[in-house]
Amino acid sequence: QPKSTPTLTMFPPSPEELQENKATLVCLISNFSPSGVTVAWKANGTPITQGVDTSNPTKEDNKYMASSFLHLTSDQWRSHNSFTCQVTHEGDTVEKSLSPAECL
């Protein structure tokens, strides 16, 4: 089975959620093979371990996909310049960043 590096897509928190003082970031990890991935989150480059929830990979068309969620408060979301979802797969590291300033 050929190796396929994951594609990352980041979704910011919804405005409705922010009004409730919550912020959930979603990192969609898709089109990878084999299924082993390690997900790490960072805020301004500093690793975050609390509030992280990563799904088990599911198979779709011979490739795998997974999602990772980062649960924050809206204050935490606004108080950082960038959030990064970093995925390690078969020795390769792929990362995608999201900036709260771009999502206002």
From Swiss-Prot:
<keyword id="KW-0393">Immunoglobulin domain</keyword>
<dbReference type="Pfam" id="PF07654">
    <property type="entry name" value="C1-set"/>
</dbReference>
<protein>
    <recommendedName>
        <fullName>Ig lambda-3 chain C region</fullName>
    </recommendedName>
</protein>
<feature type="disulfide bond">
    <location>
        <begin position="27"/>
        <end position="85"/>
    </location>
</feature>
<keyword id="KW-1015">Disulfide bond</keyword>
<dbReference type="InterPro" id="IPR003597">
    <property type="entry name" value="Ig_C1-set"/>
</dbReference>
<dbReference type="InterPro" id="IPR003006">
    <property type="entry name" value="Ig/MHC_CS"/>
</dbReference>
<dbReference type="InterPro" id="IPR013783">
    <property type="entry name" value="Ig-like_fold"/>
</dbReference>
<dbReference type="InterPro" id="IPR050160">
    <property type="entry name" value="MHC/Immunoglobulin"/>
</dbReference>
<dbReference type="GO" id="GO:0005576">
    <property type="term" value="C:extracellular region"/>
</dbReference>
<dbReference type="InterPro" id="IPR036179">
    <property type="entry name" value="Ig-like_dom_sf"/>
</dbReference>
<feature type="domain" description="Ig-like">
    <location>
        <begin position="6"/>
        <end position="99"/>
    </location>
</feature>
<dbReference type="GO" id="GO:0005886">
    <property type="term" value="C:plasma membrane"/>
</dbReference>
<dbReference type="InterPro" id="IPR007110">
    <property type="entry name" value="Ig-like_dom"/>
</dbReference>
